[in-house]
Amino acid sequence: MNNNTTAPTYTLRGLQLIGWRDMQHALDYLFADGQLKQGTLVAINAEKMLTIEDNAEVRELINAAEFKYADGISVVRSVRKKYPQAQVSRVAGADLWEELMARAGKEGTPVFLVGGKPEVLAQTEAKLRNQWNVNIVGSQDGYFKPEQRQALFERIHASGAQIVTVAMGSPKQEIFMRDCRLVHPDALYMGVGGTYDVFTGHVKRAPKIWQTLGLEWLYRLLSQPSRIKRQLRLLRYLRWHYTGNL
């Protein structure tokens, strides 16, 4: 019988990743023995692997995060290639966030939301309350000045939030979470990128069949041709994968 409250780790190019078998494993791991874990969740895909390789500050930030997991299918395939016995699957960050919010609503876990446009954040709050009765104890859109950060950290601490989700894009959200944890360490932090936009319908995700086939990247490219430069950059990751330089 599998123990869902523990998980193996796998190393790709020096980065340690948690190996979750599926979404249920991820949730059981994060809520082991009914106690929500504390630390920082970071989704890892091929693009982020390249950024880690090229940017020492980002590498240090992400290495310090406790829970790094495979959000991209390319990363999952690389783990399976390097560790043939690995039982690891993709856990999409947007899906994990929704499942965490549903669980938080069920258990009354206090949540603080950071980031996004004001109108998107307001819609996110309303939908979370209506859909799962989430206990949102505070929020702040992404349009605040650097000199306001410390006061925001204090607000988060005073709120007693046990889950803090930050939608600011990488590496801004990782920097924010690192600094906020100095003031409010007793929480689970999650960087969620554009998840609020997807959740409220402002941005469309790839249909399920594209996700299942591992072609979400292609759907995004067809929807946003301007992403071509970002996609071409990923050829370097493919070279690592196919040459076994993992």
UniProtKB/Swiss-Prot annotation:
Give GO terms: molecular function aspect only: lipopolysaccharide N-acetylmannosaminouronosyltransferase activity
UniProt xrefs under Pfam families:
Glyco_tran_WecG
| Known EC number | 2.4.1.180
What are the record keywords, sorted? Glycosyltransferase, Transferase
Its GO biological process terms? enterobacterial common antigen biosynthetic process
What HAMAP family does the annotation carry?
Answer: WecG_RffM
* Protein name (Swiss-Prot/TrEMBL): UDP-N-acetyl-D-mannosaminuronic acid transferase
